[in-house]
A protein has these predicted regions:
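Structured helix-beta-strand junction loops
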Residues: 76-77, 108-109, 177, 200
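PLP-dependent aminotransferase class I/II
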Residues: 142-204
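Conserved core of the PLP fold type I
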Residues: 1-104, 121-122, 129-134
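Short, Asp-centered acidic motifs that coordinate Mg2+ and/or phosphate
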Residues: 80, 112, 144
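Helix C-cap/helix->beta junction micro-motif
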Residues: 46, 108-109, 139
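Alpha-helix termination/capping residues and helix-transition junctions
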Residues: 23, 75, 112, 137-140, ...
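Short aromatic-enriched loop/helix-cap "lid" or pocket-rim segments at secondary-structure transitions
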Residues: 125-128, 157-159
């Protein structure tokens, strides 16, 4: 839905915004290493404790989510889980069953999932990206998704990212804050470049 969508001035900035809007100092943020280092630095820099739920390395060298460990490390202070979907740097295009299982856990434990999907247009070798919010109804109701054209189309300097928030309560709280602080207003070139990339950039 159109109203689910908003401009944001960068995904790492968006993560910082979510942390400050939806958590308090001393709350915990779950990450799944090995993962993009700002997932750790941004919560820590904002006075939140980082909880580690490392991926499991399988015998064939692939990785999978460790749900047993997640159940052990998550407690009532855990308010946010930052998901890399597809995963950077492991290169995993998460399947629906995995994402739905994660959604079940986070929804039932009142944990907000921030899904960084900046690499979604770069799934290769027949893999198909599934947005976290489309994995299940619970996923849609407990998540904020971030994306951008910058990685796929090499236009990071344009500074154009977006948020998608299906849940009414989460969206009202997040987007009201963005509006009040004028963080939802793109530069002149950001929407032009973004539309051009997605409509005409397939050959690239």
């Amino acid at each position: 839905e159109l109203e689910w969508l908003s401009f944001i001035p960068g995904i790492v900035k968006g993560i910082g915004m979510v942390i400050n809007i939806f958590t308090q100092p001393g709350d915990k943020v779950i990450i799944q290493p090995p993962v993009y280092h700002p997932f750790r630095l941004t919560p820590q820099g904002n006075g939140r404790e980082v909880v580690y739920n490392p991926l499991k390395e399988n015998a064939d060298g692939s990785y999978s989510m460790d749900f047993d460990n997640l159940a052990q490390v998550a407690d009532d202070k855990c308010k946010v889980l930052i998901l890399s979907n597809p995963h950077n740097p492991a290169g995993i295009v998460w399947d629906k069953a995995t994402l739905a299982r994660l959604a079940d856990f986070c929804y039932d434990h009142h944990i907000l999932v921030v899904s960084d999907e900046i690499h979604c247009d770069m799934a290769l070798w027949g893999n198909k990206h599934l947005p976290f919010a489309m994995a299940s109804e619970k996923a849609a109701q407990c998540s904020i998704t971030f994306g951008a054209p910058s990685k796929t189309f090499n236009i990071a300097g344009i500074v154009s990212s977006y948020a998608i928030v299906p849940n009414d309560t989460l969206r009202q709280k997040f987007y009201s804050w963005l509006t009040a602080n004028e963080f939802n207003e793109p530069t002149l070139f950001a929407p032009i470049a973004t539309i051009a990339a997605f409509q005409q950039g397939e050959a690239w």
